[in-house]
Amino acid sequence: MSRIERIQAKLSVLKPYFQEIIDESYKHTSHYDGIHSHIKIRISAKILQGKSLIANHRTINNLLIDEFNNGLHALSIEVL
């Protein structure tokens, strides 16, 4: 299972209406050489609505802690 697939599976607990996971690693090859190391997430889920930006980022980052411990270098999150 690829990192993208693992992230999709982990985010599924939020029951998103919409989720898009974009690998932006190609933009960062000059300073970081990793496969699926820079990820952008665009997501809409009822559980995230009405919460602060920090609360949403904490929720998502906590779901992905294993990915950060295994090579995920940067995560951009956009809650829609």
Q: What is each stretch, according to the model?
A:
Residues 1-80:
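N-terminal, polar/charged subdomain of small-to-medium soluble alpha/beta proteins
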